[in-house]
Amino acid sequence: SGLYEYLSVTKLEPEDQIDVLDFSLADIMTRGSTTVFEQGWCDEKSIEHMGESGLRTIVGPVASSSNFMTKDGRNVYYNMHEQQAYDRLQYVMDTRQKYDGAYDGRMTVALYLGQVDCCTPEYLDEVRRVMDNDGEMIVTIHAAQSINEYEQIARTYGKTPAGYLYDHGIVGSRVHYGHYLMPQGHSMNAMKLMKPDEELKLIAGTNTNIIHCPWSFGRRGMILESLQHYLDLGINMGIGTDTFTQDIIWEMRYAAIFCKIAEGANPFTGTAAEVFNMATLGGARAIGRPDLGRIQKGCKADIVIVDLNNLDCQPVRDPIKVLVYSACGKNVDKVIVDGKLIVDGNRPVNMDIDKVIGRMQQAQDKMIAKVPERDWAGRSADEMSPMSFRVVD
């Protein structure tokens, strides 16, 4: 699968990290996001680079007990590194001391736990103790994003991912579950560990947030079933981009469309207003920032100006519906963060976008060349992901 096979081979060379980060930041800001939540290794050089970008940034250094991989393309294996998790947890706390609130208050430091199946009970208990001592820290973890992961938690602990995390205190208004795509009742999940909806009600009842990334899974044929159901249960939902293209407008559109498909072609579900609120108020609520996600006295001047005077968006009656169903990131004209212009005319103010694109292509070329030595079967990139058409010399 893409999760277990592609991630292990798509590694960047150290010298390319900042160039690719530049590309990603340019992509995000020019397509209409004002706040980015970066989850990964997050060394100091990368953190400072993000702080200097002008975006409002949440950095989440990863600290997990293990990482998953496959040796045969059929089974998932775990490389345990429990002590590294505790060392990384201390790194997160040290990083919070140094960078949380930096860059004129635009930077927040969070904790990224990786995936639920990569965290032991003992480690989660320690994380809960840290959370109790630091009530402001945001904690994010991927959960219920694959059947392999779901079954691993069920086999090992006799719990759903939500139940397992609840038992160890990884819940609350500052906790994000990435995706939570396949709870019981999903067409791809036949397990019955809890009563219908008990799993999702547990998330709603603890005010835990779910971050929905529709395109990341939808392009592989997997969708939430359904977004409307999650909203109706009272779960706070945010929207993330998760993968290229990092277009928040595109993500709103797919969230709305996939919801209607899951609801049996009901056009009154997953409305433009609901997905717009997810991308603005829902995200702000998830990070504990009532001063974001709205234009209101006392709120931060984080503003996106979208040009609707074009063939994509005309004619206009309801600008929110036009934004969700007709516009795209290329229609973003200006982006303002904390009152400062960072995108003008759909181009970053402080980046040479042509150089950024060229360096990104070079980084990809180097990465592709090393795919065979990183793949469990020694396959090339073209074997793992065939070209759409045969390439003729």
Region locations from a protein language model:
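Active-site microenvironment of metallo-dependent hydrolases
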Residues: N277-D393
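Metal-coordinating catalytic core of metallo-dependent amide/deamination hydrolases
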Residues: E48-N189
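A conserved active-site cap/scaffold subdomain adjacent to cofactor or substrate pockets
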Residues: M182, M188, A204-H229, L233-I235
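Divalent metal-coordination and catalytic microenvironments
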Residues: G32, M50, L111, H142, ...
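Histidine/acidic-residue-rich catalytic or RNA/ligand-binding cores of hydrolases
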Residues: I147-K159, G185-L200, G221-Y230, T245-I261, ...
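His/Asp/Glu-enriched, well-ordered alpha-helical/loop segment
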Residues: Y166-R174, E225-N310, S326-C328
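Glycine-enriched alpha-helix->loop->beta-strand junction motifs that scaffold or abut catalytic
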Residues: G54-R56, M131-E136, I170-S173, L202-I211, ...
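Alpha-helical scaffold segments that flank or form the walls of functional sites
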Residues: S1-L55, D87-D104, Q361-K366
